[in-house]
């Protein structure tokens, strides 16, 4: 299965394992909660889906790469203790708590979450001295003489032997005690993730043209050449940073991430073209409705790769505009909820002044943000946005003693926030219409239009925006696309 299917399967398993009956006992006893063994190529996102599942299920996550551990850190250190058996005193060996299990209890204390996932990566690549410990871990859910706490689900991951020479195959006795899930690299599924993570538009456009270069592992006379999903994501971050600093992205830099000489050379050439198209076509001008005449003339003569790149640039530019709208709307909605809460407090009345009530609310928000940071249930960007909102609310703290006047003072910042949102929504609507004007004039209802509409359909920012601000032409072309796709499917069925 692909990584998206694996994520859903693991998430469903977590929900099933943590489901309790009316007595508060787990419906599936811990003894029958088989560990999950995830086997797949390196760099396809096994660790990332664990983080996503933990956030979505609102549980804790402890993640370990077991190859970084010795037997002592996994099992614990030995110590001698005196004990009596049958009236005789003996010296026996016991062990301190495993570092891994200790980290689970530490995580529980930090987050206040009693349930979670223990994710152990590269479990089939451990040293010979640690191999028996890993078998005991999978078979008995123990490290040394300590059991994994109840409510904690074991997910282990490893690579197939063709990707790692250090791999040790598990025997049937062990495999019969786990749920093995085999995962393969899938560009279509990864593309959805890449859009959500805002990977660089040049890389996404390149992979639309060269999907076979998404994941490659080859051995030749120069050694192993490889390209992984992780490489594309890390390269994207570097390109953004280099562009901000006006540093050129060379073939050698790309090769450090995409360790395949032909692919690195091809990506470098495409990046140069992509930036040239950015300058030549003037995407911001197109989205503002100001298209130069020579742009259409050039497109009519352009090859398919260039036309496809322009569509990608247009979609990427539109995404940037719509993302600002969505973020501003989320901020406005959150601010509105806090104001409703403050208004309710003022109506109910307390023994504090309106200013003190407002400060109390801000302190509660700060505590909530701190708790979210501890639990890791939201990412850093969301935490940063929450903190910025709290600071802006603090700047609009009321000073009036009369509740009605105090609320009016607190509401001033919100009114400004709402005005900014209205302006951005209008800009988003205009950019959407300008984009369709350009697409119709340049490509009609050709395959480029199909690609553009498909990009919008898969773009989370566009989906959220269009739900609030419908665009007639998007609905028209999307309906035509759905009808055309269904018609082809029916014809294929009849031909069979």
Features from the language model and the residues they span:
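Terminal-proximal interaction/regulatory segments of ATP-powered molecular machines
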Residues: 300-496
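AAA+ P-loop NTPase catalytic core and its hallmark functional loops
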Residues: 1-212, 217-220
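Phenylalanine-focused residue identity feature
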Residues: 79, 90, 95, 119, ...
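Arginine residue identity/basic-tract feature
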Residues: 27, 32-34, 55, 71, ...
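Alpha-helical lid/collar subdomain of P-loop NTPases
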Residues: 196-352
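Charged/polar, solvent-exposed surface patches and flexible loops
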Residues: 8, 12, 16, 55, ...
């Amino acid at each position: 299965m692909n990584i998206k299917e694996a994520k859903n399967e693991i998430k469903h398993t977590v929900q099933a394992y943590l489901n309790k009956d009316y007595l508060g006992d787990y419906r599936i006893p811990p003894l029958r909660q088989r560990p999950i063994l995830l086997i797949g190529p390196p760099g396809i996102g096994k660790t990332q889906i664990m983080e996503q599942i933990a956030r979505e299920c609102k549980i804790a996550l402890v993640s370990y790469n077991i190859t970084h551990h010795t037997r002592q850190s996994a099992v614990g250190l030995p110590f001698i203790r005196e004990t009596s058996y049958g009236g005789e005193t003996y010296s026996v060996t016991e062990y301190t708590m495993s570092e891994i299990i200790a980290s689970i209890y530490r995580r529980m204390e930090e987050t206040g979450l009693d349930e979670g996932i223990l994710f152990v990566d590269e479990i089939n690549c451990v040293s010979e001295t640690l191999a028996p410990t890993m078998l005991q871990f999978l078979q008995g859910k123990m490290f040394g003489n300590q059991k994994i706490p109840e409510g904690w689900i074991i997910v282990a991951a490893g690579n197939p032997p063709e990707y790692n020479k250090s791999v040790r195959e598990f025997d049937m006795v062990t495999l019969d005690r786990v749920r093995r899930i085999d995962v393969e690299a899938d560009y279509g599924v990864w593309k959805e993730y890449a859009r959500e993570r805002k990977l660089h538009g040049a890389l996404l456009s390149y992979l639309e043209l060269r999907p076979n270069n998404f994941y490659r592992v080859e051995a030749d006379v120069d050694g192993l050449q490889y390209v992984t999903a992780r490489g594309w994501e890390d390269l994207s971050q570097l390109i953004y940073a280099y562009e901000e600093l006006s540093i050129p992205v060379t073939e050698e830099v790309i090769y450090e991430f995409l360790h395949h000489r032909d692919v690195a050379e091809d990506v470098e050439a495409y990046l140069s073209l992509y930036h040239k198209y950015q300058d030549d076509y003037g995407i911001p001008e197109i989205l503002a409705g100001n298209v130069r005449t020579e742009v259409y003339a050039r497109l009519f003569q352009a090859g398919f790769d260039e036309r496809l790149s322009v569509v990608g640039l247009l979609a990427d530019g539109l995404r940037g505009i719509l993302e600002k709208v969505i973020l501003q709307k989320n901020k406005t909605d959150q601010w509105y909820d806090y104001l409703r809460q403050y208004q309710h407090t003022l109506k109910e009345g307390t023994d504090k002044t309106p200013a003190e009530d407002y400060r109390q609310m801000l302190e509660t928000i700060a505590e909530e943000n701190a708790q979210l940071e501890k639990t890791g249930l939201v990412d850093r960007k969301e935490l940063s946005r929450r903190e910025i909102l709290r600071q802006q609310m603090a700047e609009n703290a009321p000073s009036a003693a009369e509740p009605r006047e105090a609320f009016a003072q607190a509401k001033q910042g919100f009114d400004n926030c709402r005005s900014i949102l209205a302006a951005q929504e209008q800009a988003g609507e205009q950019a959407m219409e300008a984009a369709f004007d350009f697409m119709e004039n340049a490509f009609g209802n050709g395959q480029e239009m199909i690609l553009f509409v498909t990009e919008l359909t898969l773009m989370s920012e566009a989906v959220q925006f269009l739900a609030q601000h419908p665009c007639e032409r998007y609905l028209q072309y999307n309906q035509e696309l759905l009808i055309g796709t269904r018609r082809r499917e029916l014809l294929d069925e009849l031909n069979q």
